[in-house]
Amino acid sequence: MRNTLDNLLNAAGIVISDKQKNLLIQYVDMLNKWNKAYNLTSVRDPQQMLVRHIMDSIVVEPHLHGQRFIDVGTGPGLPGIPLAIVRPESHFTLLDSLGKRVRFLRQVQHELQLENITPVQSRVEDFPAEPPFDGVISRAFASLQDMISWCNHLPARTTGRFYALKGVLPQDELSSLPQGVLLDQVVRLSVPDLEGERHLIVLKPN
């Protein structure tokens, strides 16, 4: 698995330490093991997890600004745990409403000794942002409209951003953004060995 990860990182032009690579592989091992009992992801092959979960998450890292992030609807920790591993100077709150997912996140935190994540079991609407976050991240969570509606209380008013990971660019969602947010940036992401388009949509509170 290490050779596959090295090849993917080289293809993406991403440089991380051996320790970070080992942590990413440990995370995939744990996800694969727990997935058999808890059904945390539809991806069953660890090699595919490297592409569709690890690489698909960490290609976003250069586009994040700030130190405090919240990953809403994180599921088994995606993209929050891979991002926390490659961005150790930042802190990631991992929010999910399902107990089995949060139990998995806490076990990952314990076994990988990740000090820069905080798993939380809560509905996003009920979670207080005190203080507000630099970035609100979502991957396969909801439409842009729902994300903004449910998460509007989470980012800092002037400096905070919404980061939505999408496949094909959702032009219909972009054309009907609610009042109070502005489109800041659209980034076409390149994920080695992953078929289909990937985009990062960055929105800012107005």
UniProtKB/Swiss-Prot annotation:
Belongs to the methyltransferase superfamily. RNA methyltransferase RsmG family. It is found in: Cytoplasm. Its main location: cytoplasm. One of its GO terms (cellular component) is cytosol. The keyword Protein biosynthesis does not apply. One of its GO terms (molecular function) is rRNA (guanine-N7-)-methyltransferase activity. It catalyses: guanosine(527) in 16S rRNA + S-adenosyl-L-methionine = N(7)-methylguanosine(527) in 16S rRNA + S-adenosyl-L-homocysteine. It is an enzyme of class 2 (transferase). InterPro entries: rRNA_ssu_MeTfrase_G (IPR003682), SAM-dependent_MTases_sf (IPR029063). This is Ribosomal RNA small subunit methyltransferase G. Signal peptide: none annotated. Keywords: Cytoplasm, Methyltransferase, rRNA processing, S-adenosyl-L-methionine, Transferase. It holds the Pfam family GidB. S-adenosyl-L-methionine binds at G73, L78, V124, E125, R139. Its EC number is 2.1.1.170. Specifically methylates the N7 position of guanine in position 527 of 16S rRNA.
